[in-house]
Amino acid sequence: MSAAQIEGHCLCGEVTARAIMSKPMMRACHCDMCRSHTSSMFMSLGIDEGSLSLEGPVKTYRSSEWAERGFCGTCGSTLFYGTVKDGARHPSAGLFENAANADLKLEFFADQAPGYALAGTHRKMTAKETIALFAPETGEDQ
């Protein structure tokens, strides 16, 4: 599959998003911070590294020693989850119409999902597996 340019926007339309997506995939995170930030799980799209461009009133919140979250300064829409160390940005699937037609491929903190389950045969990582992948130095959640 060839790379596709995807475009989207926040709820009020003041923040626009553009990215390149070579391998369409959607991910879900059920960690405490994502659930607090979104009132549910956080659904993100797997995009090509460094390809996310956001224009408009973007605000960020440093949610932990190694992570930050982006949101629209006007309407509050969740824009991305990011890791501070490498500057990676994982955009909210909801910014893009039909989540850019990406299929759910991976769940993080699947063992912490509160009373719901996502259907499918995608990979489901536990909290321990997720922390080992993203925060091996600290062992800290989110």
Label every PLM stretch briefly.
Residues 1-142:
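A short Gly-Trp-Pro
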